[in-house]
Every structure is written in C-alpha cells, then in structure tokens.
C-alpha cells in the first residue's frame, strides 16, 4: 500500500497469484486468486476463503475482475500460460457463484455503466469488445452479448477498461501504447498516447 506521496507503506505477499481485488470495507478486500475468492484483512493479514473458483483447475488463474454497481463481483479466469480457451467469467453475489461466460481465452475490459444497466467485456485475442444489458439490482446479464466495438483495425489488443460518468468506455490497449475512449455507440471519441 502506498501513501498520498506514492511511498510504499506496506506490502503483502501471497502464496498464489492474486490479480484482482475489491474493497469490502476499510479493513478488508475481496481477492480473486488462482483458486478462490478470498477475504483479506489489511490490518491483521488474515486471509480466508469466501468461495472456491476453479480450484480444481490448476492451469487457470483469475484475471480481470470488477464490481458491478449492485455489489456483485464479476471475476474472469484464464489459462496461466495463455493457452486454450479454458477461462470463464463468474458472477458472485450474496454467497452465490455462477458462471456467466465460458470458453474464454483472456477475459478483460469488464466494466459497467454507472447505473448498472450495461456491461462490457472482451476476450482479448478476439479483438472485439462486447456489451449486454444487466439487471441494476443483481448485476446479472439480462440480454445476449452483442458487438460494441471491433478493434481489429486499431493498435494493440483490448485490455482493462472503465466506463466514465458520461457513459464513455476507456480501454487500455495491450501492445498499442494508447488508451481509447469509445462513445456509447462504439465509435472512437479520442485516443490518448501513453509511453508504454
């Protein structure tokens, strides 16, 4: 953890990959790991399992994950070595875990409109960002996934994303050295160059 000046104040080490975290409260995080969704106490360092996620698939790990405005946690999984499409996206809410997307290679760009009525997602190698309607109260999909933006003609691959207060989707491009802002209709609003 870093302070307001960017100085490292505290760090934690885990015995497995933990690529995503969501805030539970001031002292606790929900960690998406290789084997489970886990509760981590920032004060005591205690970690406990909330629910297993693909614990029986040692070749997989969690990847991009995001909290829906309803409080539901969408957790993507992928093959550790970027192999076959054996990953998925799960929905966790109120103690229930359900698979909502299967046959994914690298789940990324999971994000939601502020009102919780729409989700975005990509399987990075496809170079397509998809969208669907979601239930604002539960975070579950309520429609089929449709194409939001075909990014195959642009630089890089779709990676992490977020929706701003105006409903525009900001998408970082792995290997593309840019962040692209998409309008709600899927058209490119602007491209921000980044030095990586």
Task: Please name every model-derived segment.
Residues 1, 36-38, 87-90, 128-130, ...:
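A short loop-to-beta-strand structural motif that recurs across blades of beta-propeller domains
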Residues 1, 24, 29-35, 73-83, ...:
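Conserved beta-strand positions in repeat-built beta-propeller and related beta-rich domains
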Residues 14-30, 56-72, 101-119, 151-169, ...:
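Beta-rich, blade/repeat-based domains predominating
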Residues 4, 8, 25-27, 42-43, ...:
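Flexible "stalk/tail and boundary" regions
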Residues 45-100:
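Hydrophobic alpha-helical segments and helix pairs
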Residues 132-140:
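Short loop/turn segments immediately following beta-strands, especially the blade-tip
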């Amino acid at each position: 953890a870093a302070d307001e000046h960017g100085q490292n104040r505290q760090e934690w080490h885990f015995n497995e990959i933990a690529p995503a975290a969501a805030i539970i409260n001031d002292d606790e995080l929900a960690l998406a790991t290789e084997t489970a969704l886990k509760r981590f106490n920032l004060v005591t360092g205690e970690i406990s399992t909330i629910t297993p996620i693909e614990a029986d698939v040692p070749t997989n790990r969690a990847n991009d994950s995001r909290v829906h405005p309803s409080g539901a946690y969408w957790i993507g999984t992928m093959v550790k070595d970027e192999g076959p499409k054996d990953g998925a996206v799960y929905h966790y809410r109120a103690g229930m875990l359900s698979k909502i997307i299967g046959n994914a290679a690298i789940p990324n760009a999971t994000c939601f409109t502020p009102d919780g009525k729409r989700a975005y997602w990509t399987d990075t190698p496809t170079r397509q960002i998809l969208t669907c309607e979601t239930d604002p109260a539960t975070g579950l999909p309520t429609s089929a996934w449709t194409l939001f933006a075909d990014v195959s003609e642009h630089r890089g691959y779709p990676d992490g994303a977020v929706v701003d207060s105006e409903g525009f989707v900001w998408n970082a491009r792995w290997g593309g050295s840019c962040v692209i802002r998409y309008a709600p209709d899927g058209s490119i609003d602007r491209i921000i160059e980044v030095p990586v």
